[in-house]
Amino acid sequence: FILIAVSGDGSAYEVTQKQPMKLAAMEGLYEGKEGAGLVAVGLLNPKKEAYNDDVNPYLFKIEIPKLLSLMGYRNINAFVPGIKDVIDGGYTLPDGSTALSFQEKRKRGLLAHKALADFQQAKSEGRDTDAANFETIIKDNYSYFGYGFLEKEEDLIPNVPLTFYMFHFMVMVGGYFILFFAVVWYFHSRKKLENFTA
């Protein structure tokens, strides 16, 4: 059961580092904050229709203070970006660089798409110098390649209610298994001890 907790913690850390939008959706976090808490129990507001409207995303929630920052960045005061932050960019990433906006990432993704088409054409025509230049553009923008397939900001946002409730259900089941196996282990150990002393 310790492995379940360690695995869950490691997964939360990796998601935070590599997929901040997924983490924000898992927590229903629209506005990022420092010292972000982990939602233990919450009910999403069905009137929340857009990532940038002023509707409170929760009808109610109970948070464990600062736990999301701790799990995601190993720092209780770390900034955890919300959905709006991931789309707008401008916040500081763990490596010290500034997060790009969705529009900038999309622009770079489209640049990589065009460079790939130009690279293929240059190769087929035997223009090796041009092909090498296009290959450099592709490599420089490769990490944004997928963004070039998206049309608008909302395309980047997963289904928040589905993601939120499924994530919290998974955590609840994981917690249940930890408790269940701890109780079984306790009673099994106690029985062994009683048999040993009898």
Set out the residue ranges of the language-model regions.
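Aromatic-rich transmembrane-lumenal/periplasmic boundary elements in polytopic membrane proteins
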Residues: 2-107
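Hydrophobic alpha-helical transmembrane segments
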Residues: 37-46, 162-173
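Short, surface-exposed loop/turn motifs that are enriched in glycine and acidic residues
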Residues: 57, 155, 171-175
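A general structural signal for well-ordered alpha-helical packing
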Residues: 64, 163-170, 179-183
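Extended, hydrophilic extramembrane loops/domains of integral membrane proteins
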Residues: 100, 108-150, 160
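Short, aromatic-rich amphipathic segments at membrane interfaces
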Residues: 147-170
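Juxtamembrane interface at the cytosolic side of transmembrane helices
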Residues: 172-198
